[in-house]
Amino acid sequence: MENTIVIKLGGVASDNLTEGFFRQITEWQAANKKIVLVHGGGHYITKMMEALAIPVETKNGLRVTNKATLEVTKMVLIGQVQPAITTAFQKRNISVIGLNASDTGLLEADRLSDTDLGLVGKITKVKTNLIEQLLSENIITVIAPLGINSEHDWLNVNADTAACEVASALHAEALYLLTDVPGVKNGSEIIGEIATAEIEKLQSTGVIKGGMIPKLASAAFAAENGVGQVIITDSLNNSGTKIKNKVAIG
Protein backbone atom coordinates (compact mmCIF):
# COMPACT_ATOMS: atom_id res chain seq x y z
CA MET A 1 0.00 0.00 0.00
CA GLU A 2 1.23 3.46 -0.80
CA ASN A 3 1.93 5.67 2.21
CA THR A 4 2.29 2.68 4.54
CA ILE A 5 5.05 2.68 7.15
CA VAL A 6 5.87 -0.46 9.14
CA ILE A 7 7.70 -0.13 12.45
CA LYS A 8 9.22 -2.98 14.43
CA LEU A 9 9.45 -2.10 18.11
CA GLY A 10 12.45 -3.44 20.01
CA GLY A 11 12.51 -6.20 22.60
CA VAL A 12 12.09 -3.59 25.34
CA ALA A 13 9.17 -1.99 23.53
CA SER A 14 8.56 0.67 26.17
CA ASP A 15 12.00 2.14 25.43
CA ASN A 16 10.75 3.07 21.95
CA LEU A 17 7.51 4.69 23.11
CA THR A 18 8.89 8.16 23.79
CA GLU A 19 7.10 11.45 23.25
CA GLY A 20 9.29 11.94 20.18
CA PHE A 21 8.03 8.60 18.85
CA PHE A 22 4.39 9.62 19.24
CA ARG A 23 5.04 13.06 17.73
CA GLN A 24 6.44 11.38 14.62
CA ILE A 25 3.46 9.03 14.45
CA THR A 26 0.96 11.90 14.62
CA GLU A 27 2.94 13.86 12.01
CA TRP A 28 2.84 10.88 9.68
CA GLN A 29 -0.87 10.42 10.24
CA ALA A 30 -1.45 14.11 9.48
CA ALA A 31 0.37 13.48 6.19
CA ASN A 32 -2.01 10.56 5.48
CA LYS A 33 0.53 7.85 6.26
CA LYS A 34 -0.78 4.47 7.40
CA ILE A 35 1.06 2.90 10.34
CA VAL A 36 1.62 -0.77 11.19
CA LEU A 37 3.63 -1.91 14.21
CA VAL A 38 5.16 -5.32 14.85
CA HIS A 39 6.42 -5.66 18.40
CA GLY A 40 9.11 -7.76 19.98
CA GLY A 41 9.22 -8.71 23.63
CA GLY A 42 12.39 -10.70 24.15
CA HIS A 43 13.38 -8.86 27.34
CA TYR A 44 10.04 -9.57 29.00
CA ILE A 45 9.94 -13.18 27.78
CA THR A 46 13.38 -13.81 29.27
CA LYS A 47 12.36 -12.23 32.59
CA MET A 48 9.24 -14.40 32.79
CA MET A 49 11.17 -17.55 31.87
CA GLU A 50 13.74 -16.82 34.57
CA ALA A 51 10.95 -16.23 37.10
CA LEU A 52 9.47 -19.62 36.16
CA ALA A 53 12.90 -21.32 36.20
CA ILE A 54 12.69 -22.20 32.51
CA PRO A 55 16.15 -22.33 30.86
CA VAL A 56 16.83 -19.61 28.29
CA GLU A 57 18.76 -20.66 25.19
CA THR A 58 19.52 -18.89 21.91
CA LYS A 59 21.17 -19.91 18.66
CA ASN A 60 22.37 -17.42 16.05
CA GLY A 61 20.31 -14.69 17.69
CA LEU A 62 17.08 -16.75 17.73
CA ARG A 63 15.34 -18.09 20.84
CA VAL A 64 15.33 -21.89 21.09
CA THR A 65 11.67 -22.67 21.74
CA ASN A 66 10.21 -25.78 23.37
CA LYS A 67 6.56 -26.13 24.43
CA ALA A 68 7.07 -24.36 27.75
CA THR A 69 8.96 -21.50 26.12
CA LEU A 70 6.25 -21.14 23.48
CA GLU A 71 3.51 -20.91 26.11
CA VAL A 72 5.43 -18.20 27.97
CA THR A 73 6.09 -16.37 24.69
CA LYS A 74 2.39 -16.34 23.77
CA MET A 75 1.39 -15.23 27.25
CA VAL A 76 3.90 -12.39 27.41
CA LEU A 77 3.50 -11.08 23.84
CA ILE A 78 -0.31 -11.19 23.66
CA GLY A 79 -1.15 -10.71 27.34
CA GLN A 80 1.51 -8.26 28.53
CA VAL A 81 3.53 -6.49 25.86
CA GLN A 82 0.83 -5.83 23.27
CA PRO A 83 -1.73 -4.37 25.72
CA ALA A 84 0.96 -2.08 27.16
CA ILE A 85 1.67 -0.75 23.66
CA THR A 86 -1.97 -0.26 22.66
CA THR A 87 -2.73 1.44 25.99
CA ALA A 88 0.12 3.90 25.39
CA PHE A 89 -1.49 4.87 22.07
CA GLN A 90 -4.95 5.10 23.59
CA LYS A 91 -3.67 7.47 26.29
CA ARG A 92 -2.80 9.84 23.44
CA ASN A 93 -6.17 9.40 21.71
CA ILE A 94 -4.62 7.50 18.80
CA SER A 95 -6.86 4.76 17.37
CA VAL A 96 -5.11 1.40 17.61
CA ILE A 97 -5.88 -2.31 17.69
CA GLY A 98 -3.77 -5.32 18.69
CA LEU A 99 -3.66 -8.36 16.40
CA ASN A 100 -2.11 -11.82 16.46
CA ALA A 101 -1.91 -14.84 14.17
CA SER A 102 -5.28 -16.21 15.29
CA ASP A 103 -7.12 -13.12 13.98
CA THR A 104 -8.45 -14.25 10.57
CA GLY A 105 -5.35 -16.46 10.26
CA LEU A 106 -3.28 -13.29 9.96
CA LEU A 107 0.20 -14.84 9.90
CA GLU A 108 0.68 -18.30 8.41
CA ALA A 109 3.97 -20.02 9.18
CA ASP A 110 6.00 -23.18 8.68
CA ARG A 111 8.51 -24.59 11.13
CA LEU A 112 12.14 -23.78 10.34
CA SER A 113 14.28 -26.60 8.98
CA ASP A 114 16.79 -26.15 11.83
CA THR A 115 15.19 -28.54 14.32
CA ASP A 116 17.60 -27.42 17.06
CA LEU A 117 15.52 -24.24 17.33
CA GLY A 118 12.40 -26.19 18.25
CA LEU A 119 9.01 -24.54 17.72
CA VAL A 120 10.32 -21.61 15.70
CA GLY A 121 8.74 -20.71 12.38
CA LYS A 122 9.02 -18.55 9.32
CA ILE A 123 6.09 -16.54 8.00
CA THR A 124 4.86 -18.04 4.72
CA LYS A 125 1.85 -15.79 4.14
CA VAL A 126 0.50 -12.53 5.51
CA LYS A 127 -3.25 -12.16 5.05
CA THR A 128 -3.38 -8.43 4.48
CA ASN A 129 -7.15 -7.92 4.09
CA LEU A 130 -7.82 -7.19 7.76
CA ILE A 131 -4.76 -4.95 8.07
CA GLU A 132 -5.73 -2.99 4.95
CA GLN A 133 -9.30 -2.58 6.17
CA LEU A 134 -8.13 -1.19 9.51
CA LEU A 135 -5.59 1.12 7.86
CA SER A 136 -8.29 2.47 5.55
CA GLU A 137 -10.11 3.56 8.72
CA ASN A 138 -6.91 5.20 10.06
CA ILE A 139 -6.52 2.60 12.80
CA ILE A 140 -2.94 1.68 13.67
CA THR A 141 -2.41 -2.08 13.82
CA VAL A 142 -0.07 -3.64 16.38
CA ILE A 143 0.93 -7.21 15.52
CA ALA A 144 2.51 -9.89 17.73
CA PRO A 145 5.32 -11.97 16.11
CA LEU A 146 3.74 -15.41 16.25
CA GLY A 147 2.57 -17.66 13.44
CA ILE A 148 0.17 -20.57 13.02
CA ASN A 149 0.90 -23.51 10.72
CA SER A 150 -1.43 -25.61 8.58
CA GLU A 151 -2.15 -27.89 11.58
CA HIS A 152 -3.18 -24.80 13.58
CA ASP A 153 -0.17 -25.10 15.86
CA TRP A 154 1.48 -21.92 17.12
CA LEU A 155 5.09 -21.10 16.27
CA ASN A 156 7.48 -18.52 17.67
CA VAL A 157 8.68 -16.10 14.98
CA ASN A 158 11.56 -13.66 15.13
CA ALA A 159 10.03 -10.18 15.37
CA ASP A 160 12.37 -8.66 12.78
CA THR A 161 11.47 -11.42 10.33
CA ALA A 162 7.76 -10.92 11.00
CA ALA A 163 8.02 -7.15 10.49
CA CYS A 164 9.87 -7.61 7.20
CA GLU A 165 7.31 -10.11 5.93
CA VAL A 166 4.45 -7.77 6.85
CA ALA A 167 6.20 -4.79 5.22
CA SER A 168 6.85 -6.79 2.05
CA ALA A 169 3.28 -8.07 1.86
CA LEU A 170 1.98 -4.51 2.20
CA HIS A 171 4.59 -3.08 -0.22
CA ALA A 172 5.38 -0.52 2.46
CA GLU A 173 7.16 2.68 1.52
CA ALA A 174 9.37 2.37 4.62
CA LEU A 175 10.30 -0.13 7.32
CA TYR A 176 11.92 0.96 10.57
CA LEU A 177 13.59 -1.78 12.62
CA LEU A 178 13.92 -0.17 16.04
CA THR A 179 16.56 -1.70 18.28
CA ASP A 180 18.70 -0.78 21.30
CA VAL A 181 21.56 0.63 19.21
CA PRO A 182 21.50 3.64 16.85
CA GLY A 183 22.43 1.54 13.81
CA VAL A 184 24.79 -1.18 12.60
CA LYS A 185 28.24 -0.52 14.03
CA ASN A 186 31.72 -1.19 12.72
CA GLY A 187 33.66 -0.78 15.92
CA SER A 188 32.34 2.44 17.43
CA GLU A 189 31.20 3.92 14.12
CA ILE A 190 27.67 3.73 12.75
CA ILE A 191 27.56 2.44 9.17
CA GLY A 192 25.33 4.83 7.21
CA GLU A 193 24.39 2.44 4.40
CA ILE A 194 24.82 -1.26 3.71
CA ALA A 195 24.15 -2.94 0.37
CA THR A 196 22.45 -6.31 0.64
CA ALA A 197 25.36 -7.81 -1.34
CA GLU A 198 27.75 -6.75 1.43
CA ILE A 199 25.99 -8.44 4.34
CA GLU A 200 27.61 -11.87 3.99
CA LYS A 201 31.09 -10.32 4.05
CA LEU A 202 30.23 -8.22 7.11
CA GLN A 203 29.10 -11.38 8.88
CA SER A 204 32.14 -13.46 7.88
CA THR A 205 34.51 -10.72 9.09
CA GLY A 206 32.72 -10.42 12.42
CA VAL A 207 31.40 -6.89 11.92
CA ILE A 208 27.88 -8.19 12.51
CA LYS A 209 27.13 -10.94 15.01
CA GLY A 210 24.56 -12.18 17.49
CA GLY A 211 21.08 -10.73 17.14
CA MET A 212 22.21 -8.40 14.35
CA ILE A 213 22.67 -11.41 12.02
CA PRO A 214 18.96 -12.31 11.66
CA LYS A 215 18.08 -8.61 11.78
CA LEU A 216 20.19 -7.81 8.71
CA ALA A 217 19.04 -10.95 6.90
CA SER A 218 15.44 -9.85 7.43
CA ALA A 219 16.21 -6.29 6.38
CA ALA A 220 17.84 -7.54 3.18
CA PHE A 221 14.76 -9.64 2.39
CA ALA A 222 12.52 -6.59 2.79
CA ALA A 223 14.80 -4.37 0.68
CA GLU A 224 14.75 -6.98 -2.10
CA ASN A 225 11.00 -7.61 -1.88
CA GLY A 226 9.12 -4.41 -2.45
CA VAL A 227 9.85 -2.24 0.59
CA GLY A 228 10.86 1.29 -0.40
CA GLN A 229 13.49 1.81 2.29
CA VAL A 230 14.67 -0.16 5.32
CA ILE A 231 16.26 1.59 8.31
CA ILE A 232 17.85 0.03 11.40
CA THR A 233 17.92 2.58 14.22
CA ASP A 234 17.04 3.22 17.86
CA SER A 235 14.64 6.10 17.11
CA LEU A 236 12.32 7.27 14.36
CA ASN A 237 14.15 10.59 14.60
CA ASN A 238 17.65 9.18 13.98
CA SER A 239 19.05 8.33 10.54
CA GLY A 240 20.46 4.94 11.61
CA THR A 241 21.69 2.46 8.99
CA LYS A 242 19.88 2.21 5.64
CA ILE A 243 19.81 -1.20 3.95
CA LYS A 244 19.99 -0.84 0.16
CA ASN A 245 19.03 -3.44 -2.42
CA LYS A 246 22.15 -5.21 -3.80
CA VAL A 247 24.11 -2.24 -5.17
CA ALA A 248 27.47 -2.01 -3.44
CA ILE A 249 28.18 1.22 -1.59
CA GLY A 250 31.28 3.09 -2.72
From Swiss-Prot:
Enzyme type, top EC level: transferase
Catalytic activity, as annotated: N-acetyl-L-glutamate + ATP = N-acetyl-L-glutamyl 5-phosphate + ADP
GO terms assigned for molecular function: acetylglutamate kinase activity; ATP binding
Swiss-Prot/TrEMBL GO biological process terms: arginine biosynthetic process via ornithine; L-arginine biosynthetic process
Entry keyword annotation includes Cell membrane: no
Function of the protein: Catalyzes the ATP-dependent phosphorylation of N-acetyl-L-glutamate.
One Gene Ontology cellular component: cytoplasm
Protein's organism: Listeria monocytogenes serovar 1/2a (strain ATCC BAA-679 / EGD-e)
Name of the protein: Acetylglutamate kinase
SUPFAM superfamilies, per the entry: Carbamate kinase-like
Site annotation Transition state stabilizer: residues: 8, 215
Residues bound to substrate: 41-42, 63, 156
Pfam families noted in UniProt: AA_kinase
Annotated EC: 2.7.2.8
Location in or out of the cell: Cytoplasm
Keyword Ion transport: no
Disulfide bonds: none
Protein family per UniProt: Belongs to the acetylglutamate kinase family. ArgB subfamily.
Pathway connected to this protein: Amino-acid biosynthesis; L-arginine biosynthesis; N(2)-acetyl-L-ornithine from L-glutamate: step 2/4
Matching InterPro entries: AceGlu_kinase-like_sf (IPR036393), AcgluKinase_fam (IPR004662), ArgB (IPR037528), Asp/Glu/Uridylate_kinase (IPR001048)
Keywords (A to Z) from UniProt: Amino-acid biosynthesis, Arginine biosynthesis, ATP-binding, Cytoplasm, Kinase, Nucleotide-binding, Transferase
